[in-house]
Amino acid sequence: MKIGIVGLPNVGKSTMFNSITKAGAECANYPFCTIEPNVGVVAVPDERIDKLAEMYNPQKVTKAVVEFVDIAGLVKGASKGEGLGNKFLSHIREVDAICQVVRCFEDSNVIHVDGNVNPLRDIETINLELIFADMETLTKRLDKAKKGLKADKKYQAEIDFIEKIKSNLEKGIPARALEYNEDEQEMLKDMFLLTAKPIIYIANISEEQIQNADNEEMVKQVKEYASKENAEVIPLCVKIEEELSGLEEQDKKEMLEALGLEESGLDKLIKKSYDLLGLMSFLTAGEPEVRAWTIKKGTKAPKAAGKIHSDIERGFIKAEIVSYDDLIREGSMVAAKEKGLVRQEGKEYIMQDGDVVLFKFNV
């Protein structure tokens, strides 16, 4: 899973990236300090892996990972190549989801590229550039489909679909906000539209606002905007997240408790990203390794096995599965088997989040 972090200059985007990856990306109080995308890989927080590691005491523990890409800042006109527009658009095409950092705090020491703080204007600045880029993509596709229609009537469905999306884009409605039937979903995948990508808005607030984040006026504005386009909002203080990222686990817990928070904003972001992309994890456990594997919800057992190795998918015989909760409750795989909680599943089995599995195969 690859998530692109975007935002106008000086909204806290690079500071947030630093928090996530502890990569120390250059961060300065002026536009375009992020010229090339910084990439960082971060483990998905998962208590189940920690518990299984305690049970098996393996040689190796591997959590699922998310790849975060800090994408260069942009300005109005990016879709026409202004600022770092062309680079921005090429980098954002490569990600699975977008995380847009939006400034929701006042601070006279941190300049704003447009002179004052207005989160909705900032959101619309970026979204408009993505809409303009998609309009260009769709115009080219439409021309091609109209030429194809002369030889084959099947192109009519594509033409109708493109015109449906275009008419909504012209009203400022992104592709992700629309409803699609199965055929349309397949066509949409083939168009690689930027506004079809799932999006999470990070409402970057000050430390003083954190106790009452959901009731802050700017946060409420962002939430109302997001609700109209199937987007998610996470209010967090990027400065606090940066502090948390440098602490040991126990110190981090104590700081979160002192702030009245149950978990860090970054953990929320990773979990929300998983949900937004329809992802989940199955687990493998043994003395050599305890590991989480990321798959799409609805994945069948052989396809999941292919995540581990293509040979296992090709020679799939069956999957020996116990739910994580059952395994932890019984205390061992042997005890779970004695209780009849370990199942033998075939090729049509749809994997569930938290399945602990051993694949049987023959090649």
Q: Could you describe each region identified by the protein language model?
A:
Residues 352-357:
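Structural motif
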